[in-house]
Amino acid sequence: MSYQKHQQKWQLPAKCLPKYPSKWTPQAPASCPAPCPPPAPSCCVSSCCISGFGGHCSLVSLRFPRFYLRQPQHSDCCEHESSRCSTCYSSGDCS
C-alpha cells in the first residue's frame, strides 16, 4: 500500500473535524492590556514620588524633604508620572 493510499484511509471526514471560526488564531485575546512601558531611571521615580509634581520634579522636594516625605506615596502615580521624566540629574531632579 502506497503512502497516499494509507494517508487517505486514515483521514477523518470533514464533519468529524472541530469547527473553528475562520478568524480564529492562536494569538492572545484583544482584551489583554498593552505591555507596560520600560521603567524610568530610579532617580526620577524617587524625585517625582517625593515632590508630587510628576514630570516637573520640582527641586522643592530637595529643599524641604521633611514636608514631602510625609506625603503619601502612591506607586501607580509614581509609575505614571515618572514616565514623563526624560533627563535625570545627579541631584535627583529630572526634566
Curated annotation (Swiss-Prot):
Keywords: Keratinization. InterPro entries: LCE (IPR028205). It comes from the Eukaryota. Pfam families: LCE (PF14672). GO terms for biological process: keratinization. Precursors of the cornified envelope of the stratum corneum. Belongs to the LCE family. This is Late cornified envelope protein 7A.
